[in-house]
Design a protein with these regions (language model features):
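An amphipathic, basic-hydrophobic alpha-helix
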Residues: 1, 10-14, 80-85
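A short beta-strand/loop micro-motif in the catalytic core of glycosyltransferases
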Residues: 27, 91-100, 167
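Membrane-proximal helix-turn-helix segments that form the acceptor-binding/catalytic region
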Residues: 21-22, 34, 46-95, 105
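Short N-terminal targeting/anchoring amphipathic segment
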Residues: 1-11, 24-29
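Short, structured helix-loop element that forms part of the nucleotide-activated donor/catalytic region
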Residues: 106-109, 164-179
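Carbohydrate-associated surface elements
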Residues: 102, 123
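Conserved donor-binding/catalytic core segment of Leloir-type glycosyltransferases
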Residues: 97, 132-163, 167
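A short, basic/aromatic alpha-helical/loop segment that forms part
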Residues: 10, 126-128, 145-152, 173-175
Length: 179
């Protein structure tokens, strides 16, 4: 069995094809929406939810300059999506592991065979977590990557409407903007 994870940048989906041709089963754990959206995140200009490319035609990536606001980067993203098209990748992959039912549903909406989707949610062994009485505070906390696709802007908008503070812990492209 070949198990693929985050192969788009350093490696290539050709790994799935090579394994498949040799009769090796391929399991691919998805961590983003790259197989549906050249931008990875299904966000138009990093802000608005976009599912235009779900129909298989990735030309909207060019029209909207989805990749870094650049025509050249968008052309490269478009070409990559055309070369590694859905049918080709699906044929070479036996199982697609999705970390949520939402992702599995979106992959099926984008044309992937729902029978190949397996949902395996990310987990934590709560038995290994330290328990304690921390007392109730007047805030809630976000811990994670500070980037648009994580919804930090929405969190801050919501926090501004509530009588609670939000503490943000993490790093990423929005770190300086959030300070």
């Amino acid at each position: 069995v070949v198990h693929l994870n985050n192969i788009h940048t350093q490696l290539s989906p050709v790994l799935a094809e090579l394994a498949h041709r040799r009769g090796i089963r391929v399991v691919w754990t998805l961590h983003d929406y790259k197989l549906l959206c050249p931008r990875y995140d299904c966000l138009l200009n990093g802000r608005t939810v976009c599912e235009t490319c779900f129909n298989g035609d990735k030309k909207a990536c060019l029209d909207n300059k989805c990749m870094k606001g650049s025509r050249l980067a968008s052309f490269i993203g478009y070409r990559e999506a055309v070369v590694w098209n859905r049918q080709q990748l699906e044929d070479a992959t036996d199982i697609l592991i999705c970390p949520s039912r939402f992702m599995a549903d979106k992959m099926a909406q984008g044309g992937f065979d729902a029978r190949k989707m397996k949902v395996l949610c990310n987990f934590i062994d709560t038995g290994k977590c330290a328990k304690g009485d921390y007392g109730k505070g007047d805030y809630y906390c976000y811990i994670g990557r500070l980037s648009r696709e994580k919804g930090i802007g929405t969190l801050i908008d919501a926090a501004n409407r509530l009588p609670y503070k939000v503490k943000i812990i993490g790093n990423g492209p929005l770190a300086n903007e959030l300070k």
